[in-house]
């Protein structure tokens, strides 16, 4: 068990568009379906005037409620508002994003009639809560521990922010691992029994919103990431968009009307396009039918696989570039790649498979693992290893992750001096001795950067600190040892020490990059609890309302039944009918009443109806038992007694 008998640990693939959860059970990984029966859950959170929706329920209502339905939180997490990628993404989102304190992007929605602001961590934590609940419903126990995946080139603050999201959701994130590493584990488990010697594996992960290519070597259960490349803005949604644009033009031609100004029409068209795209992976042609798409006009059309491929051909070809870059970075020829693994739903597209297969000179691609589930599968295996759940089958897997970007510091003239080159296996530690730039310099400023450019101004500043108190000396004399230390989770510690005086200073690179403070996390954890209890309240309310509705309609049907009606006095019958009418009218006017009010109404109605019905049954001498339903035993009776 997870260290202290804390129940099973789960693996979560927290995706840009969809998420997936798995658990190690009975010596194998079980990918868990949600309450809708789907093995992947949309990474969507919707806010309405009465409730909060997560997953399928949120995505299903996005057409009616676009500005209060949040998705793509993964594109915001661990980034600053002023970040160029955030600025360009914002243009595409229907929901509002504003700069919060410390340049942190905040998502603004209307919830229960009030304006609320959420950070990306909070939205992601809501998706994580959903995944946790899916696992708990399946396992029948509470789940505390999880392994969560991030893209291979997520930087430090994105990893850290993902961990924070876990904390807010009430999960202990045992480890953050790279998605391709997770896919390789899933794959490695299948293959480990037979493999001898080193294997080179290329992971081709084309998801809903992002595209990642990674090259790994696997030897005797040891995974090493050699190189990563990709495009953070290429995925299934782009293919959907091409189809959407194609049909928007068609609608314009046919009807002389432009639907682009109508978000609901666009959303309905996009949903239909996503469905059509999936269908085209297995058939050559499909139809799109949308009733009353815009201004009452129905839209019917067909699209062939060939047309779909033509609309996206440039994008499909673009998918091959990172594959070449990855091989170049790893200094490897494509002929030395043993296996090519497909991950992500978009790798089901036949054209993508064909282009990739052609690139590797006709090599068979590995498709044995469901591409949507491979990452969660690997995360679940890793969770089992870390919690000591797994058996010997998995215990001897060892994970070596890498740094996605080079790490270094700024030296005189704004030059980037790299201490840890990218694709270095972590955990790792590097030391280097530096000195002062001018005579009698009293201190040095250590500025830590990540990136591949030679000038620091083109790279990303992670943090800085000062080492002061250096005794006066000519330039180049003082010896300052700088140490970069990355742990298994990819968290970076940088320290500097003056050899002569023993003066020391250090920084842990997590905090000043839009990280949440302890207090903020605490607050968010409490809020998450609050929202959860509100969701529970809402559920109670709906149940009480349904119980009352059921009872009223059942009763109405009961007294319409000839056998029963004939045994009621006209007076009693009118009494019941009036009471039911009143109850139904009250229901129509009070859909948002509190659970107690529904329950009180129910009691009122019961106390009037039940004695009359009971009297009738006694009068009938009990020969009615097996005939018309006795409403108190009907849809709603016993359910209610338990409540009060």
Curated annotation (Swiss-Prot):
InterPro entries: ATPase_NBD, Heat_shock_70_CS, HSP70_C_sf, HSP70_peptide-bd_sf, Hsp_70_fam. Residues 618-644 are annotated as: Disordered. Pfam families: HSP70. It comes from the Eukaryota. GO terms for molecular function: ATP binding; ATP hydrolysis activity; ATP-dependent protein folding chaperone; heat shock protein binding; protein folding chaperone. Gene3D superfamilies: 1.20.1270.10, 3.30.30.30, 3.30.420.40, Actin, Chain A, domain 4, Substrate Binding Domain Of DNAk, Chain A, domain 1. One of its GO terms (cellular component) is cytoplasm. PANTHER family: HEAT SHOCK PROTEIN 70KDA. This is Heat shock cognate 70 kDa protein 2. It comes from Solanum lycopersicum.
